[in-house]
C-alpha cells in the first residue's frame, strides 16, 4: 500500500510499501478494542518499533475500533507489560508509552527478613578467578541464564538478542560466570550444573532464594546485602568500596564496580520489600 511518511521537518513523502514483513504474537478483541501483543523472553533496553507499528497500522486502517499495541516481556516468573500508542498513526516516530505493569501467576512469600536469614546462613567462598562484575542489570543476568538454559548462545548471539555491543555481552556472561551460574563451552555460553538447578526451580520464591544464595557466596555482595536488607536501603558507595578492600582494585575502579553491587542489592530489595507484581 502507498503510505505517507514524514520526512524532514513537516514535509511528507509518499512511500510505496510492498509485502512488508509483519507478524503478531497475539491478538485479543473486545467490542471496543483490538489489542495486538508483541511478546519476548529477553530483557532488552530497546526494541524495533516496526514490530508494533506495522501490525498496528494495518489494523488501524481497516477497523473503526481502537487498536492497542502492547509489548510483553516474560522473565523470572514476571510478566512485564507495556502499553503504547502512536499519537500520529502515519508516523512511527510518534510512539509513546501510555502505561506499564508487572504481573505474576503466584504471590511471593519471600520477605526481607527471610532474605536476610538466607544471606547470613551462607558462608562466603573464595573470590573466583573471574573479573569482578560490571553489569548493572541483575534482571538481565538472570534473563541471560534463562536463555542459555534453553539453548547455548555464542557471544554474537547474546549481542544480537540484547542489542548489546560485544563488550556488554562479555560483561553479562562473565557476571553469571562470576556467580558460578554460567560457563564458556567452546564458542558458546551454557549454565553450569548449579546454574541450571537454580534457574529451573519451578517456584519463583525458590528461584529467587537460590539467586540470593549465589550472591551471598561472594564476600562483597554478602556484606552489601546484609547491610541493605537490615536497613531496608541499599548500602552506600563508601560502604561497598570498603567491602572491596583486598580485591586489588584502584579507588576509581572500586567506585565503578560499586554501582553494579548497589544495583544488584537494589534488585534483592525490590524482590522482597516492594514492587510486588499484581496477581493475575
Predicted features and spans:
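Short, hydrophobic/π-rich interface segment
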Residues: 37-63, 237-256
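Active-site beta-strand-loop-beta-strand hairpin of nuclease catalytic cores
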Residues: 27-36
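Short, positively charged
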Residues: 30, 82, 90, 98-104
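Nucleic-acid nuclease catalytic cores
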Residues: 35, 40-48, 59-89
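Donor-sugar nucleotide-binding helix/loop cap in glycosyltransferases
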Residues: 94-280
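Short glycine-rich loop/turn motifs
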Residues: 21-26
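Single conserved hydrophobic/aromatic residue that forms the stacking wall/gate
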Residues: 2-12
Amino acid at each position: 500500500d502507498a503510505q505517507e511518511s514524514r520526512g524532514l521537518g513537516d514535509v511528507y513523502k509518499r512511500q510505496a510499501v510492498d509485502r512488508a514483513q509483519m507478524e503478531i504474537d497475539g491478538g485479543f478483541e473486545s467490542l471496543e478494542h483490538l489489542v495486538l501483543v508483541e511478546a519476548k523472553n529477553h530483557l532488552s533496553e530497546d526494541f524495533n518499533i516496526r514490530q508494533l507499528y506495522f501490525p498496528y497500522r494495518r489494523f488501524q486502517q481497516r477497523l473503526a475500533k481502537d487498536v492497542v499495541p502492547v509489548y510483553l516481556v516474560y522473565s523470572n516468573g514476571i510478566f512485564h507489560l507495556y502499553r503504547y500508542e502512536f499519537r500520529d498513526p502515519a508516523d512511527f516516530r510518534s510512539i509513546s508509552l501510555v502505561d506499564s505493569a508487572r504481573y505474576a501467576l503466584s504471590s511471593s512469600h519471600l520477605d526481607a527478613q527471610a532474605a536476610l536469614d538466607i544471606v547470613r546462613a551462607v558462608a562466603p567462598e573464595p573470590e573466583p578467578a573471574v573479573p569482578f562484575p560490571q553489569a548493572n542489570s541483575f534482571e538481565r543476568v538472570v534473563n541471560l541464564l534463562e536463555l542459555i538454559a534453553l539453548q547455548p548462545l555464542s557471544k554474537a548471539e547474546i549481542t544480537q538478542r540484547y542489542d548489546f555491543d560485544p563488550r556488554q555481552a562479555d560483561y553479562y556472561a562473565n557476571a553469571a560466570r562470576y556467580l558460578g551460574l554460567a560457563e564458556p563451552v567452546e564458542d558458546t555460553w551454557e549454565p553450569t550444573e548449579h546454574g541450571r538447578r537454580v534457574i529451573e526451580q519451578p517456584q519463583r520464591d525458590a528461584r529467587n532464594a537460590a539467586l540470593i544464595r549465589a550472591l551471598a557466596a561472594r564476600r562483597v555482595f554478602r556484606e552489601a546485602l546484609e547491610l541493605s536488607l537490615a536497613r531496608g536501603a541499599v548500602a552506600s558507595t563508601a560502604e561497598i568500596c570498603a567491602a572491596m578492600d583486598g580485591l586489588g582494585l584502584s579507588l576509581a575502579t572500586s567506585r565503578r564496580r560499586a554501582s553494579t553491587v548497589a544495583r544488584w542489592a537494589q534488585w534483592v530489595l525490590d524482590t522482597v520489600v516492594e514492587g510486588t507484581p499484581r496477581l493475575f
